């Protein structure tokens, strides 16, 4: 008596045939805020507090008359508090960035809007603090004052402006002509005209210009990454939320931010089939710092 034939078993679906779930954020907005946004913001608040004690301030500012600022800058305890706050803030910001990156790299959090919110929250406390790590922003302001006075900044240094030292200009660059382009000098002139004889207010307005560059980066980098087959969230996390970017471009208020932001925006719109606008934006970036013009031929390659 023969055995019954085995029942037909349908072949298993190959893993490649299985539907791939769309990546979604692995936690709620509240979880995201508690895990990354709030700790990073506390970090930049501490950095801003530290900047009151060890950041660059011009001699000609009423902020030095504030008793808290005076204590942070003129006493041993104040110096210790300022340095401790700065170091603790940087460590906390770095930790928050790395934790966020862990989620992004695992694909747990790919929501660009969340990353933009984290960036805005981390930057906010740095908007009003004294410049850190560089006082170039006061040289920008002085060069704007040169323009207002009708002095050619390509032949004369910031020392040609009366009171340049009290304005916070670094003596190392006081005699040097400007290395920057016409577009940046026009912006600096506008800031100097608007703020008048108030170098710290001028520095804060200059910071708005550099933050505009960071905003352009945050918009452009994900688009460039998408066209290159890279996850936009990973590119945004690595290229814009990086603490080095926040320290140099926001806390340091360095005009490299505007140059790089314009160039990145130019590349992004070129990839979106707007090459003429791309050329204009990259050219403006080169008119902030002439080294940016090196990027112009790459628009042609993308075109």
What are these regions (language model features)?
Residues 294-303:
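Perimembrane helix-loop-helix junctions
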Residues 216-220, 259-274:
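Specific aromatic-rich, kink-prone transmembrane helix
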Residues 41-62:
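Alpha-helical transmembrane segments of multi-pass membrane proteins
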Residues 91-101, 204-228, 237, 261:
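Transmembrane-helix motifs of polytopic, lipid-linked glycan transferases
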Residues 109-211:
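Intramembrane catalytic core of multi-pass membrane enzymes that act on lipidic substrates
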Residues 199, 203, 214-217, 237-259, ...:
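Aromatic- and kink-enriched transmembrane "portal" helix at the membrane-lumen/periplasm boundary
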Residues 1-46, 66-125:
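Start-transfer (signal-anchor) and selected internal transmembrane alpha helices
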Residues 109-117, 221-243:
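Transmembrane-helix signature of polytopic, membrane-embedded enzymes
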